[in-house]
Amino acid sequence: MSALYFQNLPSRPANKENYTRLLLKHINPNNKYAINPSLPLPHNKLQISSQPLMLLDDQMGLLEVSISRSSKMTNQAFLTFVTQEEADRFLEKYTTTALKVQGRKVRMGKARTNSLLGLSIEMQKKKGNDETYNLDIKKVLKARKLKRKLRSDDICAKKFRLKRQIRRLKHKLRSRKVEEAEIDRIVKEFETRRLENMKSQQENLKQSQKPLKRAKVSNTMENPPNKVLLIQNLPSGTTEQLLSQILGNEALVEIRLVSVRNLAFVEYETVADATKIKNQLGSTYKLQNNDVTIGFAK
């Protein structure tokens, strides 16, 4: 198993790349991707052939940092290494010397299942022929795709549960020696009732959801550089802590969040510090499906 899990990490920001660099910085302060934020992070594809691997950290043999989308796992991450031996060495090192990220002592251990990338590397080494290997990978991908869909699509999840309930109902009726024609009738009635309930619940949900009015976004393109950034079009519920994780550095002075207008003023020590963050993130930044704009305040 070449994957490890981390627990008790800081709550992750929406930007996975920034989070990855944060972990790299604490794992290895000399990591080139942690030192230079403008250096693009490597992305490894599934090993469907003997293609070269690109490492996040050469010293540790670290390949990938994976983050679950589940809200229950906001303080967790999974790290994939090139080999099981490198994962074991990493685990042994931080068993004797605690790893801390932003002051939090990280708990870690071997993952119960390998990451998809780690699994593909493992299967690539063991594969006897391409056809069998590709079928195995497709099976894993299909299962994980279904799992993601069930988490994100409530209707799909309910229909999936309904199919399972129908299978159990059929099994229960057959164990009671009920005639097949009667089983079909009972199952049909059960399925119809459940589908009607789902449809009714979905319609009620649509009626209760009213579109929120968004505050007008001011044009900051012509504003001269200064040490205060204006962050606009923030998602509802954005917190100062979240903004600090995205926009914070050692030069951060203050974050003034104006929730009713979905914007924030972020002040740094110097104009150069503010400019550096703006250039790093760009004029627009994706946050929870919102195109957040970043510019200099007047």
Curated annotation (Swiss-Prot):
Q: Name one GO molecular function term.
A: U1 snRNA binding
Where does the UniProt annotation locate this protein? Answer: Nucleus
Question: Which SUPFAM superfamilies does the record match to this protein?
Answer: RNA-binding domain, RBD
Per UniProt, residues of the RRM domain are: 2-113, 227-298
Write down the CDD domains for this protein, in alphabetical order. Answer: RRM2_U1A_like (cd12247)
Listed A to Z, the keywords are: mRNA processing, mRNA splicing, Nucleus, Repeat, Ribonucleoprotein, RNA-binding, Spliceosome
Which Gene Ontology cellular-component terms appear in the entry?
A: commitment complex; nucleus; spliceosomal complex; U1 snRNP; U2-type prespliceosome
What biological processes does GO assign it? mRNA 5'-splice site recognition; mRNA splicing, via spliceosome
Q: Could you say what the effect of mutating residue 228 to I is?
A: Splicing defects
Its family? Belongs to the RRM U1 A/B'' family.
Function in brief: Involved in nuclear mRNA splicing. The principal role of the U1A is to help fold or maintain U1 RNA in an active configuration. It is the first snRNP to interact with pre-mRNA. This interaction is required for the subsequent binding of U2 snRNP and the U4/U6/U5 tri-snRNP.
- Please tell me what else the database record remarks about this protein: Present with 2950 molecules/cell in log phase SD medium.
The record's note on quaternary structure and interaction partners says: Component of the spliceosome where it is associated with snRNP U1.
What name does UniProt use for this protein?
A: U1 small nuclear ribonucleoprotein A
The record lists the organism as: Saccharomyces cerevisiae (strain ATCC 204508 / S288c)
